[in-house]
Regions:
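Basic, Lys/Arg-enriched alpha-helical interface segments
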Residues: 1-70, 112
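Enriched for short, Lys/Arg-rich terminal
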Residues: 76-80, 84-112
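Basic/aromatic recognition patch in beta-strand/loop cores that engages polyanionic ligands
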Residues: 58-88
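Compositionally biased, intrinsically disordered low-complexity regions enriched in proline and serine
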Residues: 9, 25-27, 72, 80, ...
Length: 112
């Protein structure tokens, strides 16, 4: 029998919560509430998946270029979830469309 895997607590910053609201509002306006609900459900599954696999994904290349390696990203195309592991917690700072200017978004949210 395989040992039970420890779960991490996943926390969303206020900025990440606002990101989810913005994504929902945009999709609801452009593509309908049903599609917005579906996308929100799938994004939340990705968020909750970090409780079991907090180290999945990679370091954002925009931050690595600045010598910052303590953040990780999980991609849920086209969205990127940017988080940081701290003790037994995964703190999600940013949930955005990866086609946006990530350098500016990361600088404003994480370094600003």
């Amino acid at each position: 029998m395989v040992g039970r895997q420890k779960r991490y607590e996943v926390l969303l910053t206020q900025g990440a919560e606002r990101d989810l609201e913005s994504i929902y509002d945009y999709i609801a306006e452009v593509d309908g509430k049903a599609n917005a609900n579906d996308m929100l459900d799938r994004l939340m599954e990705a968020v909750e998946g970090l409780a079991r696999f907090p180290e999945r994904g990679s370091c954002p290349k925009e931050l690595v270029a600045l010598g910052i390696k303590e953040y990780r990203q999980t991609q849920f195309k086209p969205y990127r979830l940017i988080c940081r592991l701290m003790a037994r917690q995964v703190v999600i700072y940013l949930i955005v469309d990866g086609r946006r200017d990530m350098q500016s978004l990361l600088a404003n949210r994480l370094l600003g």
